[in-house]
């Protein structure tokens, strides 16, 4: 079931957090046990790009950035994804021409524009499928907490607007596992954006002694936005972040509609949005991820004044992706050497 994250997750003090804390202790113990178990190993370098919390953090454009750089370096990258929100069961290699978001999920379909993508709840099986296709580098989209595949390097992405939320483990807060466990198993953190919420992230990550990197999301629709008035709608992890980005590009956001993450818009939803925009002489605005789901609707052709906002990651360190990939390969070679010594 696709739901929105509760508002109290992002507040320091809440009665609901207090009420759910005993349940979060149990969930935290279970997630810790999952994370420290022995992992299946594949004979390919594996970079995991995950996050600490439930809800969107900006992983998808980061995975895309790594896929692009990996190809520039001569790799044939393959992306392992859960295919969240899609109906397909078992392992499936995405065909962008024939698959749609209802079958394989919106994120996986976006990623398939840039690399081979295999979806499965078992990431080891998905990685094996990519190996059969000739891929020589695995980019794991999420999966840090579920621990279904050994990873040579784990990069965790944090949305600076939300940080770690109230710092509690699900369901009392947004954390997918205790911070102590996640910190011990990660390799570095990528903080996207800047806000007051990120100060705590910087403090806590710095205390671990592990690397903290910085980046910003850059809209690719900037030339189309200035001076226009919008009805903006989105079904993503943090719709307010999208609405704010339009304003930062000198667009005027008159109306907003927020839907649950990975929401599939009905024909009625879209007709209502089109009608509202026409009545108020507004442009429609949505995200590239939302648009992959809109493409399954019969009303898509009626979305005349629609601007689709895609984003890319602007890393503070220009050669960031190359640097991380070099570290991944170094660890992979070390892993192979140790294996050969033992066997």
UniProtKB/Swiss-Prot annotation:
- Residues bound to ATP are 53-60
* Pathway it works in: Glycolipid biosynthesis; lipid IV(A) biosynthesis; lipid IV(A) from (3R)-3-hydroxytetradecanoyl-[acyl-carrier-protein] and UDP-N-acetyl-alpha-D-glucosamine: step 6/6
Q: Does the keyword Nucleotide-binding apply?
A: yes
Provide a Gene Ontology MF annotation, just one.
Answer: ATP binding
Q: Which Pfam families match?
A: LpxK
Reply yes or no: does the keyword NAD apply: no
Mention any one GO cellular component term assigned to this protein in its UniProt record: plasma membrane
Which UniProt keywords are given for this protein, alphabetically ordered?
Answer: ATP-binding, Kinase, Lipid A biosynthesis, Lipid biosynthesis, Lipid metabolism, Nucleotide-binding, Transferase
EC number from the UniProt entry: 2.7.1.130
Reaction catalyzed: a lipid A disaccharide + ATP = a lipid IVA + ADP + H(+)
Could you mention a single GO BP entry for this protein? lipopolysaccharide core region biosynthetic process
Function, as annotated, reads: Transfers the gamma-phosphate of ATP to the 4'-position of a tetraacyldisaccharide 1-phosphate intermediate (termed DS-1-P) to form tetraacyldisaccharide 1,4'-bis-phosphate (lipid IVA).
HAMAP family assigned: LpxK (MF_00409)
Which protein are we looking at?
Tetraacyldisaccharide 4'-kinase
Provenance organism? Bartonella quintana (strain Toulouse)
């Amino acid at each position: 079931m696709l739901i929105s994250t509760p508002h109290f997750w992002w507040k320091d003090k809440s009665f609901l957090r207090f009420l759910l804390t005993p349940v979060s202790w149990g969930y935290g113990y279970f997630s810790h046990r999952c994370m420290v178990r022995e992992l299946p190993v594949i004979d390919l370098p594996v970079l995991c790009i995950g996050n600490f919390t439930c809800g969107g953090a900006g992983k998808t454009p980061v995975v895309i950035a790594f896929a692009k750089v990996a190809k520039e370096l001569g790799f044939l990258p393959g992306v392992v994804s859960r295919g969240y929100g899609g109906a397909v069961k078992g392992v499936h290699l995405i065909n962008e021409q024939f698959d749609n978001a209802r079958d394989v999920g919106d994120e996986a379909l976006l990623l398939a524009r840039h690399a081979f993508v295999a979806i499965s709840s078992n990431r080891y099986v998905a990685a094996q499928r990519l190996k059969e296709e000739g891929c020589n580098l695995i980019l794991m989209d999420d999966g840090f907490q579920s621990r279904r595949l050994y990873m040579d390097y784990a990069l965790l992405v944090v949305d600076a607007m939300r940080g770690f939320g109230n710092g509690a483990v699900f369901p009392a807060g947004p954390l997918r596992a205790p911070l102590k466990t996640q910190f011990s198993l990660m390799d570095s953190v990528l903080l996207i954006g800047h806000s007051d919420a990120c100060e705590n992230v910087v403090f806590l990550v710095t205390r671990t002694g592990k690397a903290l990197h910085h980046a910003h999301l850059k809209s690719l629709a900037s030339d189309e936005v200035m001076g226009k008035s919008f009805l903006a709608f989105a079904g993503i992890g943090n719709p307010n972040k999208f609405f704010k980005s339009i304003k930062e590009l000198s667009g005027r956001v008159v109306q907003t509609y927020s839907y649950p993450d990975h929401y599939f818009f009905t024909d009625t939803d879209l007709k209502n949005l089109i009608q509202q925009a026409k009545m108020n002489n507004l442009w429609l605005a949505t995200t590239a991820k939302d648009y992959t789901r809109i493409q399954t609707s019969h009303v898509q052709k009626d979305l005349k004044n629609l601007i689709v906002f895609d984003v890319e990651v602007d890393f503070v360190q220009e050669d960031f992706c190359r640097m991380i990939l070099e570290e991944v390969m170094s660890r992979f070679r070390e892993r192979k050497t140790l294996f050969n010594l033992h066997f």
